[in-house]
Regions:
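Long, low-complexity serine/threonine/glycine- and acidic-rich segments characteristic of extracellular
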Residues: 33-86, 90-176
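Short intrinsically disordered, low-complexity segments
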Residues: 9-11, 37
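Sec-dependent signal peptide recognition
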Residues: 2-8
Length: 176
């Protein structure tokens, strides 16, 4: 019995493929392309002014700050200031488990409106909630918009009913 098992293992080892098929790595849904070179308009003022801050934890993720991917978990997060800075991720109402009315990106205490509703099938699949498929956000800051040095960014997710917002913790980053 042992001899037969050894023979099977040896046969399998000898017939194993030394050149496996090349596999395509699927694109990272969270890694949005960098903004194109060229003029970028300054971001619009945020939408959360006058809304009540909710106490619940925001359901959000900040995928990138410029060239820094996953700045929440990979510190120090740094990006050059001589190019446009894309900040993107996803956010949704954690209480309603539904898309938000919008998202603001708050940089050093100033809120800027983000484009909201980008496709994020990965979010819908992860949370097993098909209604969260359009919860992506992005805001692009023009080159030179932020001075070199340390900054903090937070994400404000506007509740689905539009009556308040959920705010993330501040995430530090540096513009070089």
């Amino acid at each position: 019995m042992k001899l037969r098992a050894v023979a099977v293992l040896v046969t399998l080892a000898l017939t194993a493929c030394d050149n496996p098929k090349p596999r395509q790595i699927p694109p990272d849904p969270m890694a949005k392309a960098l903004p194109p070179a060229g003029p970028v308009a300054p971001p619009k003022d945020g939408m959360t002014q006058g809304l009540a801050k909710r106490t619940e934890v925001a359901s959000f993720y900040l995928d990138r700050v410029g060239e820094a991917l996953d700045p929440l978990n990979k510190q120090p997060a740094g990006t050059p200031g001589d190019a446009a800075i894309l900040m993107s991720g996803f956010g949704f109402d954690p209480v309603a488990k539904a898309p938000a009315k919008g998202v603001d990106v708050v940089i050093d205490g100033k809120a800027y409106a983000a484009a909201y509703g980008a496709a994020r099938e990965d979010v819908a699949n992860y949370f097993k909630t098909p209604g969260l498929a359009a919860t992506g956000y992005a805001v692009t800051l023009p080159a030179g918009f932020l001075v070199n040095g340390p900054h903090k960014v937070a994400v404000r997710v506007i509740a689905a009913d539009g009556k308040g917002y959920f705010e993330s913790p501040a995430i530090p980053f540096t513009v070089d």
